[in-house]
């Protein structure tokens, strides 16, 4: 059995396959995902697992150089924005319109669906190198 923090086989596989500048997305239960993007559905019920639980788990194994958030999170979900900024204090943030965020899912290795039920709780993680 795997000893590291990420034990979900699909998430582990996707992270292992990622290279520099590749993207992985984590989001709320309502985010529409293109059919061409792999969806790893972890949602069980309202709030389970939470967005932050999944983000914290993924960050145990994924080196991230930049994150992308919806511009709308600033006004529609400031508590989530604060939690993300606290978790990734040194990581540059690019704010983009939510419509662009949905389009960017076409360029992601995968989308991890959580049970999060708060607005604009979606993130694009741009991978870094570990050397």
UniProtKB/Swiss-Prot annotation:
EC number: 5.4.99.62
Biochemical pathway: Carbohydrate metabolism; D-ribose degradation; D-ribose 5-phosphate from beta-D-ribopyranose: step 1/2
Oligomeric and partner information: Homodecamer.
Function (record text): Catalyzes the interconversion of beta-pyran and beta-furan forms of D-ribose.
Gene Ontology MF term list: D-ribose pyranase activity; intramolecular lyase activity; monosaccharide binding
One GO-annotated biological process of the protein: D-ribose catabolic process
Entry keyword set: Carbohydrate metabolism, Cytoplasm, Isomerase
Enzyme active site: 20
Family: Belongs to the RbsD / FucU family. RbsD subfamily.
Gene Ontology cellular component list: cytosol
Organism of this sequence: Enterococcus faecalis (strain ATCC 700802 / V583)
Compartments where located: Cytoplasm
Pfam families, sorted: RbsD_FucU
Keyword Isomerase: yes
First-listed, main subcellular location of the protein, grouped into a coarse class: cytoplasm
Transmembrane residue ranges: none
Protein name, UniProt field: D-ribose pyranase
Residue positions binding substrate: 28, 98, 120-122
Catalysis performed (reactions): beta-D-ribopyranose = beta-D-ribofuranose
Cited PANTHER family: D-RIBOSE PYRANASE
């Amino acid at each position: 059995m795997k000893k590291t923090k990420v034990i979900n086989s699909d998430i582990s596989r996707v992270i292992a396959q990622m290279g520099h500048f590749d993207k992985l997305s984590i989001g709320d239960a309502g985010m529409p995902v293109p059919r061409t993007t792999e969806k790893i559905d972890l949602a069980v019920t309202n709030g389970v697992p939470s967005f932050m639980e999944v983000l914290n788990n993924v960050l145990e194994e994924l080196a991230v150089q930049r994150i992308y958030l919806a511009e709308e999170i600033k006004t529609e979900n400031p508590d989530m924005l604060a939690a993300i900024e606290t978790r990734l204090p040194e990581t540059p943030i690019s704010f983009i319109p939510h419509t662009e965020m949905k389009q960017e899912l076409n360029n992601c290795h995968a989308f991890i669906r959580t049970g999060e039920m708060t607005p604009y709780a979606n993130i694009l993680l741009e991978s870094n190198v570990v050397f």
